[in-house]
C-alpha cells in the first residue's frame, strides 16, 4: 500500500538531490519549453511557447529545495518517539489534530537547523538564474563589470549583498529557533 508513494518520493529525492542546481534550472527552463512546443505542435498549434524565466527558476529551485528538505523532515520524523502518536490517541485526539497540535511543533523545532542551512544554500543558488537571463544580483553585477571594467568593486558589492541577505536570514532563523525552543530553557538550567 505504501510502496508506490515511498518509491516515488525516494526517486524524486534522489534525482533532485543528485542533479546540480544549474542543470535542474536549465532542464526546467529549456526542456519544458521544448516539450511544450512539441506537444502543442502535435495538437496543431504552430506558435511559439515561452516559459517565464522567473517561473522556471522558481520551479527548479522549489524542486531542489523540496528534495533536500524532504530528507530533513524524514530525519525529524524518525527522531520522534512512537509514544507521541500513542499519547495523542490516548488523549482522544484525531490523527489530524494530533499531528498539527502535538507532532508538527516538535518536528518543526527539530527540522529548523537543517531548513535554515537549506535556505542559505538556496539563497546562494539564486546567483545561477543569471544563466537563463533572469535579472538578479549577479546578472546586474556582471553587467556593471562589463560596462565599467571594475570587477573588484562590483563583485565586492555583490559579496556584501549576499552576506547581508545571509546575515539577515541567519538572524531570522536564530529568532525562530529560540522561540521554538523557549519551553526547553527552564529544563536546561
Predicted segment positions?
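Transmembrane alpha-helices and adjacent helix-loop boundaries
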Residues: 1-189
Amino acid at each position: 500500500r505504501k510502496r508506490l508513494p515511498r518509491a516515488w518520493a525516494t526517486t524524486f529525492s534522489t534525482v533532485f538531490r543528485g542533479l546540480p542546481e544549474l542543470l535542474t534550472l536549465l532542464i526546467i527552463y529549456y526542456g519544458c519549453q521544448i516539450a511544450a512546443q512539441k506537444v502543442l505542435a502535435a495538437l496543431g498549434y504552430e506558435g511559439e511557447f515561452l516559459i517565464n524565466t522567473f517561473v522556471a527558476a522558481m520551479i527548479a529551485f522549489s524542486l531542489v529545495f523540496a528534495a533536500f528538505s524532504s530528507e530533513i523532515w524524514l530525519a525529524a520524523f524518525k527522531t520522534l518517539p512512537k509514544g507521541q502518536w500513542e499519547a495523542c490517541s490516548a488523549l482522544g485526539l484525531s490523527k489530524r489534530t494530533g499531528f498539527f497540535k502535538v507532532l508538527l511543533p516538535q518536528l518543526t523545532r527539530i527540522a529548523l537547523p537543517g531548513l535554515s542551512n537549506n535556505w542559505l544554500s538556496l539563497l546562494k543558488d539564486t546567483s545561477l538564474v543569471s544563466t537563463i537571463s533572469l535579472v538578479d544580483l549577479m546578472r546586474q553585477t556582471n553587467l556593471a563589470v562589463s560596462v565599467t571594467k571594475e570587477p573588484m568593486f562590483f563583485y565586492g558589492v555583490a559579496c556584501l549583498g549576499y552576506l547581508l541577505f545571509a546575515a539577515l536570514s541567519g538572524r531570522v532563523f536564530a529568532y525562530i529557533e529560540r522561540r521554538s525552543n523557549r519551553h526547553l530553557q527552564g529544563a536546561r538550567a
